[in-house]
Amino acid sequence: NLSPDHIGPGEHKTFEEYRSWKGQLFRRCDVGVVNIDDENTEALLEGHTCKLVTYGRSEKADYRAEGCELLRTHDFLGVAFHVSGRDNMDVRVNMPGEFSVYNALAALAVGKVLGLPDAAIHEGLGKCVVKGRVELVPISKKFTILLDYAHNEVSTESLLTTLRAYHPHRLVVVFGCGGNRSKLRRYGMGETCAKMADFSILTEDNNRFEKIEDILADIRVGMNKGNPDAKFVEIPDRLDALHYAVDHAQEGDLIAVIGKGHETYRDREGVKTPFLERELLEEYAQQIGLE
């Protein structure tokens, strides 16, 4: 997959430059496993020298997903589908949505290239949980809350599109943006959440050496562009924001806490202190006697 990330000061100057460098991978490997549905795949593979294995929803894919079904309970979000093409297999994945289908297909294709038996691939996909990637924190039967590393416009839009497909009562997002990073991420995430979430809780996410007030001001610019009537609240301290999300959750809500995912720290003024969102949510739920 390829999307317009890692562009800005200290990274790549343009998307074209980023794509060019990433395309070098397919001139330096024996086998390339690629998403045939990605609009950038053709340009990415220009001049490739490796053998290609493709996956996707397209009829042309070597490993193709069909009959996708979304699955949800208060403590489970997942998807089931059938794989056809070079294989014939029913798959159930403990992670939700379209992007999980693509991730599972990619893993399956790599497994086949490496010669893994179908039984091992099937079992692995069924048990797979990626820490900080649509990671459910089952603290209540009333609502669903999850952690995800989405930290730019593209990944946020993909995640919210996925979660919206499960038809929650409200889609609530808790997010911030990193300090000393491109402001484009702040504008983009703000705009996306304003358009796609029912309610947003703006907070910190590794401020580093920037003031949280300045970061939130940039996010507001994106929010106002995306939807001037968007409903949101600003809570600078991320722990307070987590507590607010739990305290104000409604029956059937789906709450996405995004940006940090698997990270275990909070960075303020270059000082990193422990901050494990899963543990903090579990401790708070126990503290208030949440059911």
Enumerate the language-model features and the residues they cover.
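ATP-dependent carboxylate-amine ligase
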Residues: 49, 86, 106-119, 123, ...
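Short, polar loop motifs at secondary-structure junctions
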Residues: 36-40, 57-58, 262
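Extended acidic/charged loop-beta regions that coordinate divalent cations
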Residues: 1-10, 42-90, 123, 128-133, ...
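A conserved FAD-binding loop/helix module that cradles the flavin
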Residues: 99-100, 114
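A short glycine-threonine-serine/GTX helix/turn-capping micro-motif
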Residues: 91-98
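Flexible active-site lid/hinge loop adjacent to a nucleotide/diphosphate
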Residues: 1-47
